[in-house]
């Protein structure tokens, strides 16, 4: 993201973005005044739905790991999830991290038990298998639904010792350039460039915390102001919202305000 794009309001970027998913997301963020994504790594449908009833008003996006839901069913899990997304006006991002050849990910995305392409606005993929992964996922989406879908590439990770950096990150960016309409951005800790070639990538950053600096399993947290200053568009927060002793409604509003104020400061709107 260039300095010019970095200081533009989300609504301005929505006006010219080639992806309908990105346009919808940017406009939603402006309408709700939030750039918060809730990461709901919970293992039952009830836990997920109950949490979203509490944080739904404060988020633009929910990030799911649907394959850890022990009682998953399309009717029992996805239908009410979609209803909550409509009720509270947020989008859905299934954090699937696809990492196989194009033909395989095509089947994984559109079929199986989860039918991800049918209900998730956004998903993500590693670049390790090359650009065929983008082609396969896009084809799957087009075969399953008329609704627009978007893909994030995993350029950088927030865990200690992650090898997604340097040359790997550079090659992942090159893969992203192969499809301007379907690839909407990155999971990353920093800007990924591209603006000089006409790309406006959405940067979503995990590992954001207002209180904790890390955990025992290698997660490293950065503050909201830190990540926003390095080009993040959407902050991804999980345990900071619903960890032990936390009130999700209170924390949701707290992170929403922190993220939005950091965005307003970056875009000179304060």
UniProtKB/Swiss-Prot annotation:
Molecular function per GO: orotate phosphoribosyltransferase activity; orotidine-5'-phosphate decarboxylase activity
Pathway assigned to this chain's UniProt record: Pyrimidine metabolism; UMP biosynthesis via de novo pathway; UMP from orotate: step 2/2
Pfam family for this entry, one: OMPdecase
SMART domains: OMPdecase
Binding residues annotated for substrate, in chain numbering: 41, 63-65, 95-104, 221, 239
GO BP: 'de novo' pyrimidine nucleobase biosynthetic process; 'de novo' UMP biosynthetic process
Active site, per annotation: 97
InterPro entries for this protein: Aldolase_TIM, OMPdecase, OMPdecase_AS, OMPdeCOase_dom, RibuloseP-bd_barrel
Reaction(s) the record says it catalyses: orotidine 5'-phosphate + H(+) = UMP + CO2
Transmembrane spans: none
Enzyme class: lyase
Record-listed E.C. numbers: 4.1.1.23
Key words, A-Z: Decarboxylase, Lyase, Pyrimidine biosynthesis
Entry-linked PANTHER family: OROTATE PHOSPHORIBOSYLTRANSFERASE, URIDINE 5'-MONOPHOSPHATE SYNTHASE
Family membership noted in the UniProt record: Belongs to the OMP decarboxylase family.
NCBIfam families, per database record: pyrF (TIGR01740)
Name under which the protein is recorded: Orotidine 5'-phosphate decarboxylase
Gene that this sequence comes from: URA3
